[in-house]
């Protein structure tokens, strides 16, 4: 059995439930028999001690995702390499979808040597691999330096729109959410990267789900390396926690999981729209997400009870970016113009992460379309939190605002929400 990860320091803070925001929200928690009620889920301060990008936007704050450093002030962008994917059926074909960010990992030596499908790269010290899900239904593995395939792709059977996620302990364990039902049942598929075997399948057509007819997983989950658990939202309207029971032996070249499942099911009385497309944010024992009806929630992962809820006004697919550098942790979020469309406003907000209090709102007019096909507008991209020289700014990218031929990158003042510049 592989040695346990190094000790991790949990994040502690004071936060109390806001019952006035929860009067119209009902919930239930469905647990497999082996998962105790008191199973404590607290994310450590450091998501991973391995060099890489292991989930969408890098980790629980959904505010990173970069790998490496720019050595000097760049004056131009240069295309270094490209990789051509295969193609699935129309209309998805190939390439990447929303969100489509790759995972990147500098494999630790013991992990690299445990994966024979890497071939000669098992002996390449410092090897960095790019792992990309595609609309062609495959997961592609590329050498970061050359862009050449580093091992054979994994064929999942369905187009992948979201971002794959890797085990932040450095274990060769890959989580792939499928976006479109095409050839096989749709859901979350878990693969070991020793022999590329599927070790677990979480079906999207869950009999406990409020939205059983759509089982996609565009969300990129979070793995708690301390508790060996994985949390992810489904478009079927459920929030899942998987207690993995991971068994990895790099000497025997074996990796197995035996997940037990916790399901968080909820209903907001004012909404008939279910489904989580964004990737959950987390701070210690608090998790944050939004749904297709615009309900933004904070839940206590230790008990799976909601702490607060907020009605954003419309579908919220962009992940909630969490800024922990402020005196109090804040969430930056925004909604689309979808159910309120085709003409309406995208509302960009800063929310106190501990209370759900809206600290500012800045709204921008947008225009979607109903014909010849429905097209939504507003915020789809996850906000980017400024650091360093731009630590006072937060960046939003909005679509079809104010009209169908327009879009903008907005820099807003973190403290006030005022527009500083746009492009």
Predicted features and spans:
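Extracytoplasmic/lumenal domain signature
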Residues: 2-42, 48, 56, 63-217, ...
């Amino acid at each position: 059995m592989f040695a346990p990860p190094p000790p991790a320091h949990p994040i502690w803070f004071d936060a109390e439930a806001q019952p006035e925001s929860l009067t119209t929200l009902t919930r239930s928690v469905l647990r497999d028999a082996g998962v105790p009620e008191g199973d404590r889920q607290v994310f450590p301060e450091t998501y991973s001690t391995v060099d890489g990008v292991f989930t969408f936007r890098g980790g629980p704050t959904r505010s990173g995702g970069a790998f490496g450093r720019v050595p000097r002030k760049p004056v131009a962008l240069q295309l270094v390499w490209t990789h051509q994917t295969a193609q699935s059926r129309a209309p998805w074909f190939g390439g990447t979808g929303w969100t489509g960010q790759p995972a990147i990992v500098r494999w630790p030596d013991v992990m690299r040597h445990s994966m024979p499908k890497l071939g000669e790269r098992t002996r390449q010290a410092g090897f960095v691999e790019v792992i990309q899900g595609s609309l062609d239904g495959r997961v592609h593995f590329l050498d970061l330096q050359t862009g050449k395939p580093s091992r054979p792709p994994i064929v999942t059977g369905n187009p992948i729109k979201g971002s794959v996620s890797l085990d932040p302990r450095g274990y060769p364990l890959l989580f792939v959410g499928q976006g479109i039902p095409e050839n096989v049942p749709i859901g979350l598929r878990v693969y070991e990267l020793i022999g590329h075997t599927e070790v677990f399948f979480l079906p999207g057509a869950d009999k406990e789900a409020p939205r059983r007819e759509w089982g996609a997983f565009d969300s990129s989950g979070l793995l708690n390396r301390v508790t060996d658990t994985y949390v992810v939202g489904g478009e079927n309207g459920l929030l899942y926690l998987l207690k993995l029971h991971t068994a990895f032996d790099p000497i025997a070249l074996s990796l197995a999981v035996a997940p037990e499942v916790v399901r968080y099911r909820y209903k907001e009385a004012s909404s008939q729209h279910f489904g989580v497309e964004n990737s959950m944010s987390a701070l210690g024992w608090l998790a944050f997400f939004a749904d297709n009806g615009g309900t933004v929630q904070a839940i206590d992962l230790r008990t799976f009870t909601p702490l607060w809820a907020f009605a954003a006004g419309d579908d919220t697919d962009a992940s909630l970016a969490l800024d922990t550098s402020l005196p109090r942790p804040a969430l930056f979020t925004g909604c689309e113009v979808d159910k309120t469309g085709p003409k309406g406003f995208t509302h960009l907000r800063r929310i106190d992460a501990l209370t759900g209090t809206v600290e500012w709102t800045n709204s921008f007019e947008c225009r979607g379309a109903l014909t010849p096909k429905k097209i939504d507008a507003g915020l789809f991209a996850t906000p980017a939190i400024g650091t360093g020289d731009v630590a006072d700014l937060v960046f939003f990218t909005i679509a079809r605002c104010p009209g169908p031929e327009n879009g903008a990158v907005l820099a807003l003042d973190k403290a006030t929400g005022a527009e500083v510049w746009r492009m």
